[in-house]
Structure formats: C-alpha cells, structure tokens
Amino acid sequence: MENADRIKNLPPYLFAEIDKMIARAKKEGVDVISFGIGDPDQPTPDNIINKMIEAVKDPSTHSYPSYEGMYEYRKTVADWYKNNYGRELDPDKEVVSLIGSKEGIAHLPFCYINPGDIALVPDPGYPVYKTSVLLAGGKPVQVPLVEENNFLPDLKAIDEDIARKAKLFFINYPNNPTGAIAPEEFYEELIDFADKYDIIIAHDAAYSEIGLDGYNPPSFMQFEGAKKVGIEFNSLSKPFNMTGWRVGWAVGRSDVIESLGRIKTNIDSGIFEAIQYAGIEALTGPEDNIEKMTELYSKRRDLLVEGLRELGWEVPVNKATFYIWAKVPEGYNSTEFSTHVFEKTGIFFTPGNGYGEFGEGYVRIALTVTEERIKEALERLKNSDIKFK
C-alpha cells in the first residue's frame, strides 16, 4: 500500500535517527558518550514518585480521565502562573492539560491551518513546529534566528505579505537549540506584531525553569496583551526529569484553548489521573528540586565549557536551557564535524542543520551527561587529532 502524501513529504524525525545511529554504534562495541538528545539523566524527585505511587493505588484514578484535565490539575497550573508571573488564568477556559507539550504543539495547526495556509516557524528550531504544519497541509515559512540578532527573530524583516497571510507563529524561549534568551521588550514587540497581523502566537516555554546563574526566564503570559494574541505551552519534562511521564499544559487565549481541547477530545482520552496528581505535586512541592537541577546544569556547563576552551574551541556560555550552541571549527559543516568527532572518539554532538537551514555551522551539546562522563569526553577529545581552532 502506498503511503499518503503527508507521510511521503515528512522528513525523518531527527532524534529518532540519532537514537538509531547511536544504537548501531553500541552494538558494534563503541562506548558512546552522547551529548545528543535533551533527556535529563537524573531521576524524578522522590516526592513526585511517592505521590504517583499513592495515586496509582487509588482505584478511582483507574477510569477514563477528563479530556481537558482534572480541575485540580488545571487549577494548580493557574495558581502556578499567578504565583510565578502574576498572571490570572481561568482554569475552566484558559488551561488545558496535554500529554506532554509536544502533543499540543503537534495538534495546534490542525485547529487553524487549512491546505496551503502559512505558519511562521523559527529556524533553527524544534523540528515538531515545522512537521506539525506540514501534517496539517500548511506551508511552514522560516524565520531565521542568527547570532547577529542574539538568535531572536527580526520581526521587521518578515515580509509584509507573508505576515498578513500567516495564521500561526511558533516561538520558543529559552530557546532550543540555541540556548538563547529573550528580553522583555522582545515579547512586547511580538505581541504588537501578532495583534497587527492577526497571528496566533504559540510560545513553547519547555525550558522556563532552567535559568542559570540567577537568571529567571519570563513567561509570554506575563505580558499585557499576551492572552489576546496567543497561548503558551509548558511541560514538567525538563525541570522535574519527567520526560517519560508525558504531562504538560497549554494556557492563554480561551478560544484557542477551546479549539485545542476539541481536537484532543477526538484524538486522545486525556492524561492518566495518577500522573496528574504527580504533576500537582511537582508544581506545589519543594522549591529546592528546581534549585538542585539548575545548580547541576551550571556545574556541568562550567566544566565542559572550560575544558573545550582549553582545547581551543571557543564555545559560548548559555544562560538558560541545558544546551550549548557551538560553532563548528573552520573547514567543516555541521554534519561533517559531528560525524568526524563521533568516528574518532565515540562522542556525539547533534549537527545544527538538523534544526533547519540556519542551524548549519553549529552543533548542539546537551548537558544531560554526568560530570564523570564529561571529564571522560574531554580526555578523549584532548587525545584525538581533532583540530578545534
């Protein structure tokens, strides 16, 4: 049977391909040190696990859950925004639970994109922004993120005709893959831009809790007018080491939240209630869970950056996320350098061109590796003949 065009036109998912490549190498006996996928290596905090165990033992959680999420969970999310950002949210109309934020990101274009419609996507960017638009039959239009503009979209450079036709604009700060942060004035300009052109902003805040060196990332929702023009996705995956739990949310503009919820009622059956109780515990439990996590990534970053710079590779210091976005040495493109390092040392860095055309010339280095393995990686690189200058 021939595949549908939507599958034929869909590129392979970057991280699935990375998994396959690393698995092949391990089968061949390679001791792989992967800085590739942003999957925290630490365990979920004990208080969250214990709440999950308690909830699983309660038979009332074993039935079909609510499509939009338990009221208690949605209320906790709303309270979290109030306490952290001073933003009031209606848990009944402005909050919907998600089976991880990726699910909501993938479903949103189906709410608004008809065949041929335009959505703006950051480049480089999380691949799901582009593929979700393609699956909905839309046309993703790249918005370059370049170092000269601090990896922020230049809103004034977006073609007027494109802006008038665009229906969605995916934004993500702190940013994956660049580790960039967005100042408050950028969000204010973004809201004005969206209001002018009647574009729905979809802000992906998956790394909102991973601010380093005392930096506290803002929320799109905290700015005046944000609820009028868009929504924000977030997840418990990265800050609480819960990538496998699949629990997140979307908040903001009520008609967009309603549309996203309507899609979900026809596709999935919601989040297992025991996981939602664990999510409530994550958002209301000890604050030192976040502090321990950010301290860990700061230490790893400092160790790795210092070691790579000693080798002559001038990598930047990220202020948020657990990613270092590093220029490859002269004479290589992203794939060539990543492959060369992997073949020589068994160390994997993700080639930047996997995140889009404007990711060429970079690699993404995830700090989801223990200090011991970081030291081992630095030693391997030091003993190799790889030129970093």
Curated annotation (Swiss-Prot):
Residues recorded with modification N6-(pyridoxal phosphate)lysine: K238
One annotated GO molecular function: L,L-diaminopimelate aminotransferase activity
PROSITE patterns on file: AA_TRANSFER_CLASS_1
Reactions accelerated catalytically: (2S,6S)-2,6-diaminopimelate + 2-oxoglutarate = (S)-2,3,4,5-tetrahydrodipicolinate + L-glutamate + H2O + H(+)
GO biological process: lysine biosynthetic process via diaminopimelate, diaminopimelate-aminotransferase pathway
Binding residue positions for substrate: Y13, G38, K102, Y126, N176, R364
Keywords from the UniProt entry: Aminotransferase, Pyridoxal phosphate, Transferase
EC number from the UniProt entry: 2.6.1.83
InterPro entries: Aminotransferase_I/II_large, DAP-NH2Trfase_DapL_Desulfo, DapL/ALD1, LL-DAP_aminotransferase, NHTrfase_class1_PyrdxlP-BS, PyrdxlP-dep_Trfase, PyrdxlP-dep_Trfase_major, PyrdxlP-dep_Trfase_small
Role played: Involved in the synthesis of meso-diaminopimelate (m-DAP or DL-DAP), required for both lysine and peptidoglycan biosynthesis. Catalyzes the direct conversion of tetrahydrodipicolinate to LL-diaminopimelate.
Annotated family: Belongs to the class-I pyridoxal-phosphate-dependent aminotransferase family. LL-diaminopimelate aminotransferase subfamily.
Subunit description: Homodimer.
Protein name in UniProt: LL-diaminopimelate aminotransferase
Species assigned in the record: Halothermothrix orenii (strain H 168 / OCM 544 / DSM 9562)
Gene: dapL
